[in-house]
Amino acid sequence: MRRKTLIGVLMAAVVGALVTLLVLTQHAPPSVDIMAGSSLIANIIGDVAGGKLRTDTLIPPGTCPGHYDVKPSEIEALANSRAFFIHSFQQSYENVTGAIEAANNPGLIVKVLNVTGNWMVPAVQAEGVSKIAQALGEIYPENAVYYQGNATERAQVILAYGEGVKDRLQQGSVDGVKVICAEMQAGFVGWAGFDIVATFGRPEDLTPAQVANLINEAQEAGVALIIDNLQSGSTTLGASMEQDIDAVAVTISNFPGGLQNTETWEKAIDKNVDLLLEALNEWEEQDG
């Protein structure tokens, strides 16, 4: 009898422990080593850290970094992160500062990555890799040499890949082709070799008079493409102007994952180039 009672007590204890473990697992807060302000940063952390750090991205790649409404689950992840890496342009964004405040994480290390230029440009991307490796080394000094070694290799890969992309663009005869483009794409479009006649901001911020001026400038210059930015929200501006300008509208992305099957920097830059060359070919066919 005593033996049966003891077995019953042990079984009850085991069941209780399993139930407790299940509850804790279901309700455990997300744990992230590094929260990233963009997919660009998150991808680089993965490369530099060799996939050994858990990362999450605060801002989805297909949305505007300054206008995204951060979700409670993302704030909870930030509350349980050791560090938060952001672009220098994000440090004044209300959605970012608000998320940091709402996370209420006194131990959170915020690293601002001071890199100038469009991160889709190979040289800028390589600089971002270096800055992220340095920041990771400051947080995890025991792994600093490992991070730096990975960063050096990754930067070399990026620059070499960029040369191949540049060759594709030159073969596509983009040098000197006149375009108008979104301000947020000017760095990449200029690097690609296009002649930027004018730039424009977010479509909802443009007045009818500004749109009319853009059309006039584009008509006078004889632009071939109107290049929109995916993350600016509306991608209809170019489409609405192309008939007046006799140009082709195309939308490209500033972040890996913004367009389908572009989860890495290489895939994202290749997709952008594909779209630009396709649009240029379309313009050449209709123009001539």
Report each predicted region and the residues it spans:
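Structured C-terminal subdomain patch of bacterial secreted/periplasmic proteins
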Residues: V32-D33, N80, I215-G288
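Alpha-helical, coiled-coil/dimerization segments enriched in small aliphatic residues
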Residues: A49-E74, Q185, V189-I215, T251-T262
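Extracytoplasmic/secreted envelope proteins and their assembly/folding machinery
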Residues: S38, A42, I75-L78, Y93-T97, ...
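Extracytoplasmic substrate-binding proteins
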Residues: Q26-P30, N105-K178, F255-G288
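Secretory targeting signatures
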Residues: M1-P30, G288
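Helix N-cap/beta->alpha junction signal
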Residues: S38, S88, A182-E183, L230
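Short, well-ordered beta-strand elements
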Residues: V32-G37, L53-L58, K178-V179
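Acidic/His-rich segments in extracytoplasmic proteins that coordinate ligands and/or metal ions
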Residues: K52-I139, S234-V248, L275-A279
